[in-house]
Amino acid sequence: MAALEEEFTLSSVVLSAGPEGLLGVEQSDKTDQFLVTDSGRTVILYKVSDQKPLGSWSVKQGQIITCPAVCNFQTGEYVVVHDNKVLRIWNNEDVNLDKVFKATLSAEVYRILSVQGTEPLVLFKEGAVRGLEALLADPQQKIETVISDEEVIKWTKFFIVFRHRVLIFITEKHGNYFAYVQMFNSRILTKYTLLLGQDENSVVESFTASVDRKFISLMSLSSDGCIYETLIPIRPTDPEKNQSLVRSLLLKAVVSDNTQNGVALTALDQDHVAVLGSPLAASKECLSVWNIKFQTLQTSKELSQGTSGQVWYYGEHLFMLHGKSLTVIPYKCEVSSLAGALGKLKHSQDPGTHVVPHFVNWETPQGCGLGFQNSEQSRRILRRRKTEVSLQPEVPPSKQLLSTIMKDSEKHIEVEVRKFLALKQTPDFHTVVGDTVTGLLERCKAEPSFYPRNCLMQLIQTHVLSYSLCPDLMEIALKKKDVQLLQLCLQQFPDIPESVTCACLKIFLSIGDDSLQETDVSMESVFDYSNSVHDEKMEEQTEILQNGFNPEEDKCNNCDQELNKKPQDETKESTSCPVVQKRAALLNAILHSAFSETFLLPHLKDIPAQHITLFLKYLYFLYLKCSENATMTLPGIHPPTLNQIMDWICLLLDANFTVVVMMPEAKRLLINLYKLVKSQITVYSELNKIEVSFRELQKLNQEKNNRGLYSIEVLELF
């Protein structure tokens, strides 16, 4: 009989779960340890038995993790991808992800898959698959496109079947679903069309799968609340032919078709599945365990605080977001038999039976395909490389374009580059772009008068470059004080060091307004401040309005007196932008850039105090603009967020407060910032009080609904 034991909270730390929940929960190389990746910037290693985190790692602000972190079971290292293309590898001894091994890939990654006994696989969004070792040998290698246009990967699973690796992934296009099965021992990729049957209008909400000797049992939970099964052969009869598979009804009406927070399905063993959702239209979310062999509900647990519609299962533990905390529910299923009741249960397993373990196979494959390049040597070596990145791939360059770069004029080079970019992308497109930029930069160093900025800007806009691939690019742009090129690099490169970011900030603050007027910069992040509607009362009030909140309890009498004495011209100055619009666009690019506070603060101390004051005035102006509306956002296509504004205010004050406080012209600004922070603290304090009150009301209103459950107990007679 299957049973769900008492749940417990893995950590009281509130995870950064987005609208779709967490990115994933993956098992570590220790049985009791798991990697949890939130939907923002953080990976946390938890130990379930101790109910506490063992380590936490975050990418820089401005970067975002795009697929769950996994463990490389061969080396004990962890692997994660942020910003779709940047791969990071680290271990427990590493503290900061900025200093660990990094590789910038040539295509966007969908998921990294890892199981015991083999190296991880990297599945790209275009359907191609690479072994991790083969990919690290040449990160910029060409990645082929497997799936068709507008086809999107929805789900994937990695199995080990009789020492052979099998990968399955499901795609969707215009409501049609397809299954791809990759056999790595024979390098066979088979495509199947999944026919939905009679209910063609239903949408598949969740997938799960188990495997036996001949078939992959693909189970899907549809929007009609039913679970369907599709049997996919592991060894197809005709791999070259696109075959169709019809699904069959497995369980009917296991969840309501009106579930708001989504549903989830996961296989527990060959006979049981866990379903997360609302069983009835008016009921709360529940975690239910069903016996698919006898089509019966085994047990159910109500989740009163709601979930994210996600569930993961490893080693007799079910993981899910319950409310705001990561919750673990132990699961056990013991086989009832007459022999067990008599104490004569056979403990030796019949060789003919096959039981699906937590990982399908723990044995190591020998000589499997897909890039097993001397993996024995790689298993013994931990990657402790901190900053070693191959700056240029070793693929032969395009000789014609490179010869043009080395000897022709800037206009001719620009024409040739434009012709190359207008052509359809070739297999060596990424390599040629990298080599072209390298050749241009080498000639710039050799000939100071040579500076093909138009060519460089066109190549940057191909979205295949990064700072680690061409670090000399921004160095030359800084020497030339080319703010347009620097702005473009800040917008396109996800891995710019903090020292370079601060160097750009110095130039953006020091360049004259006359020089900016002659420069063409991107203005999409800036709106017309002069045409914005101001509330006339805003100029007269002395307090900061924080989202409609007026801190009447502010007792800073001295501050109030100082602000009440300010002349009219200074009042207008506080409600008008302190910088011209083009400088504002450049500063917005700085606000959007990724950074690590530890490495950024030392460089901020080198910026002159008058420039720091100007930047603080601009940030304070942006905050006032945010506070004019209830959403606390700025108009525009890609404006700075309130969090970015507050982060930079704190950083600038932390680095330069002792210098700024001595400047008479900064006195009023510091008083305004003081009141700003005080009002923020007051608002969040009141919000916390409201949250506590809501929790108490929720506890009073909770009612436990007793549902009548039944089960079929199977007795095995020997």
From Swiss-Prot:
Chain's role: Ribosome biogenesis factor. May be required for both optimal rDNA transcription and small subunit (SSU) pre-rRNA processing at sites A', A0, 1 and 2b.
Molecular function GO terms recorded: RNA binding
Protein name, UniProt field: Nucleolar protein 11
Location (main, coarse): nucleus
Nucleotide-binding among keywords: no
The keyword Cytoplasm appears for this protein: no
Listed Pfam families: Nol11_C (PF20998), NOL11_N (PF08168)
Gene Ontology cellular component annotations, sorted alphabetically: nucleolus; t-UTP complex
Species of provenance: Pongo abelii (Sumatran orangutan)
Keywords attached to this entry: Activator, Methylation, Nucleus, Ribosome biogenesis, rRNA processing, Transcription, Transcription regulation
A biological process from GO: positive regulation of transcription of nucleolar large rRNA by RNA polymerase I
Upper classification of the organism: Eukaryota, Metazoa, Chordata, Craniata, Vertebrata
Domain of life of the native organism: Eukaryota
Modified residues (N6-methyllysine): K346
Quaternary organization: Interacts with UTP4. Interacts with FBL/fibrillarin in a transcription-dependent manner. May associate with the proposed t-UTP subcomplex of the SSU processome containing at least UTP4, WDR43, HEATR1, UTP15, WDR75.
Cell location: Nucleus, Nucleolus
